[in-house]
Amino acid sequence: GISSGGLGWFPDGILEHFDLVYFDQRGLGLSGELACPKAYAKDFSNYLNYDDSVGEEGYDTPAEQQDAIDEARTFVDSCVSEIGIDPARLVYYGTNQVAEDIESFRQLVGDDKFWLYGVSYGTSVAQIYAAAHADHLAGLILDGTIDLTLNGEEGALAQEKAFDEVLVATLKACDADESCAAELGGNALAAYDSLASKLAEKPIAYEYPLASGKKVKKKFTFSQLEFTASYQMYALGGRMLFLRALASANEGDMVPMARLLYQQATVDPAADEYLGDSTFSDTMFYSVNCTDDSYFSGTQEERIAQTIEAGQASNGTVPRLDGSVYTGLYCAYWPSAPKEFVTREPLTAAGV
C-alpha cells in the first residue's frame, strides 16, 4: 500500500533464501514526506460527522452537491498550501515515477534480475514496473491485485462492489453459525440494514466511556457505519469483531462499534482529534490516486459535473457501501491530475 510499514510482515526464514530491499516511496517517510495533517483532519472529520438529513443518502440535492464540491476544493487548496510544495512538482509523485525509482535502486544494487512483491497498491507499482522493465524481473508476486485497465471511476465502483460482497458474505456466514445467528436473530443482513436505515434517518446518540472513567456524549452517523464496515472487512479478525459490534448495536449498545470506528479512523475519542497513522499517508493517497488518473475527461468544470452524475448513477447500485466515485471531485482540483482518461492495456511481460 501507500505506506511505510512492510518489513514486519516477512518471517525471518525468508532471509535464508532472499535479500529483502524495502524503501519509502517518494513522498513517504524518509523519502521527502509530503503531508497535510491539518487539512486532512478537517476534511476527514467533516466526512465522518456528515449528517445527510435531506433526501436519500448521498449528494442528491443541488445544495449537497455544491457543499461537496466546495469541500473538495477547500481541502486541495489547504493541503497543497500546507505541504509547501510547488504544485507543478506533484506530477513526480505518481506510480509511474515510483516504478522508475525502483529501476534506479536496481541499478544501484547491481542485480540484473530480482523478484518484485506487491500488495494492494503495491501491485500497481509492480505491474507498471513489469510493463517498463520486464527484462529485469525474475518474477512477480501479487496479492490483492488492482486491475490497471480500469479508469478511476470504474476502479472506484469495482472497489465498492468488492467491499459490499465481502460484507454480505460475512453477514451470511454469521447466519450459518449457531452462536452468531443467535446474537443477530438469525438474519444478520437484516440487522445491518436496520441499523443503516436508522442511521440514514438520523444519527444515534450514545455515551462513550473514556479511559478516565468519564463518559462523553457522542453521535454515530451513517458515514461512520460505512467507514467502519469497510475497514473491518480487510481481515478475518476484523470481520469477526464487526459482527460482535453489530450484535451489540442490535441491542442498542453503540460503544463496541464506536471502538472499532476510533481504532480504524485513528481518532482520539476524548478530544475528537485525528491522530493519523504513522504507517499510511493520507496525503499521498490523494496525490498518487489523482496523479495516476483523473477519473473523468475534460475541463475542471466538466470533470466535476461528470463526477456528480456518476455518483448519482451509482447510488443504490452498491446497496450498502458506496460513494468512492466522489473522489473524482478531489482529483478535479488536484494540480497534477491529468486532463484526460488514463488508459492502460492488459499487462504482458514475456518471461516474467
Regions found by a protein language model. Give the residues of each.
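A catalytic-pocket lid/entrance helix-loop region that shapes and gates access to the active site
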Residues: 35-53, 128-194, 231-232, 243-270
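Alpha/beta-hydrolase active-site loop
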Residues: 43-108
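Loop/turn elements at helix/coil->beta-strand transitions in domains of secreted/extracellular proteins
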Residues: 16-21, 26, 65-66, 73-75, ...
